[in-house]
């Protein structure tokens, strides 16, 4: 109830702006970690449906939550309200030396397969086609001190673009 109340307050305060709700990552190792119940697909579904009706599906956040919860990534994603997708965020994951999952890295084969699975559901009409798909790479999450690699972006962007065109056919 508190989550819905807060979102409705924001929607009233910013009534001229569209509100899109993003599924968050589960990062139990962070001091500001989102409580696990807020990441359960059933609650995400309820909150999105009773407020904005628009989901920003962060595929990597969903994959990370599923890994930490010990459930299959596809099962976790399938339980989210795919018919309410408005936007998609895509990034790669990496297992840190501390054994914790991180996002905004280069896409691994496993990440590409999950993206393809999501896009296939959209292509078949099971989920709504997003208005926007964003490749999130680099930035402050690269905790190993290295800057974002331009070659990685140059390699991943065209491949992702082709997948988006395939999804839209």
Positions of predicted regions on the chain:
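C-terminal helical cap(s) of enzyme catalytic domains, especially alpha/beta-barrels
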Residues: 144-169
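Alpha-helical scaffolding segments of alpha/beta enzyme cores, especially the outer helices
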Residues: 5-12, 39-46, 50, 75, ...
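Aromatic-anchored, glycine/proline-accented short structural segments
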Residues: 34, 38-90
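Active-site acidic/histidine proton-transfer and metal-coordination neighborhood
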Residues: 1-54, 64, 151-152
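Short, glycine/acidic-enriched loop or turn micro-motifs at the edges of active sites
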Residues: 25, 61, 139
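Gly/Pro-rich active-site loop or hairpin
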Residues: 65-130, 138, 144-147
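Secondary-structure boundary elements
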Residues: 8-18, 49-56, 82, 124-127, ...
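Hydrophobic faces of well-ordered beta-strands that scaffold small-molecule active sites
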Residues: 19-22, 55-57, 86-90, 131-136
């Amino acid at each position: 109830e508190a989550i819905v109340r807060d979102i409705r307050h924001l929607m009233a305060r910013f009534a001229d702006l569209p509100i899109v709700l993003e599924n968050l990552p589960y990062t139990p190792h962070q001091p500001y970690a989102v409580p696990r119940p807020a990441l359960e697909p059933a609650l995400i579904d309820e909150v999105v449906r009773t407020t904005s009706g628009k989901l920003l599906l962060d595929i990597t956040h969903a994959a990370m939550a599923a890994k930490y919860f010990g459930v299959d990534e596809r099962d976790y994603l399938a339980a989210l309200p795919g018919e309410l997708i408005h936007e998609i965020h895509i990034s790669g994951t990496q297992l840190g030396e501390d054994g914790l999952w991180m996002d905004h890295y280069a896409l691994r084969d496993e990440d590409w397969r999950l993206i393809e699975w999501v896009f296939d559901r959209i292509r078949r009409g099971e989920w709504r086609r997003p208005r926007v798909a964003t490749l999130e790479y680099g930035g402050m999450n690269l905790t190993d001190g290295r800057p974002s690699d331009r070659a990685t972006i140059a390699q991943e962007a065209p491949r992702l673009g082709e997948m988006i065109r395939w999804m839209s056919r």
